[in-house]
């Protein structure tokens, strides 16, 4: 399994996110202005794109988001893998002694992020129809 980094959207990122967030979960506004300039990671299995996420800095903190694994590859710890890659990339860019990463997690998968040592802060809010919670981790 290998990964590649991209600045801005590419076809593989679009394909994975469309499959997961639009086709499966019914989101309508999946792509935004941030996608044009942020970093994206794509995991590949024999050149097949299977997982993606994006990360970017906003103010003092970094954000990881749009974590998506195609259906047939779920349950293989690829979410852990892509989050570790993103955190390593952020750690390399972080100039401060402490580095805070924020995630806007779907409430239904917040336990996944808790296992990666992210803590929920604030209240549940809606992104389109789906409950989300802000979660943070200090590196």
Model region roles, listed by residue range:
Residues 36-37, 60, 127-131:
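Short acidic/glycine-enriched loop/turn segments that link adjacent beta-strands
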Residues 1-13:
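A short beta-loop-alpha structural element at the N-terminal edge
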Residues 69, 75-89:
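Conserved acetyl-CoA-binding loop-helix of GNAT-fold acetyltransferases
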Residues 15-28:
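Helix-loop element at the rim of GNAT/NAT acetyltransferase active sites that forms part
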Residues 60-71:
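Conserved acetyl-CoA binding element of GNAT-fold acetyltransferases
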Residues 29-53:
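Conserved beta-hairpin
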Residues 102, 114, 119-134:
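Conserved catalytic-core motifs of GNAT/GCN5-like acyltransferases
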Residues 83, 89-106:
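Conserved GNAT acetyl-CoA-binding A-motif
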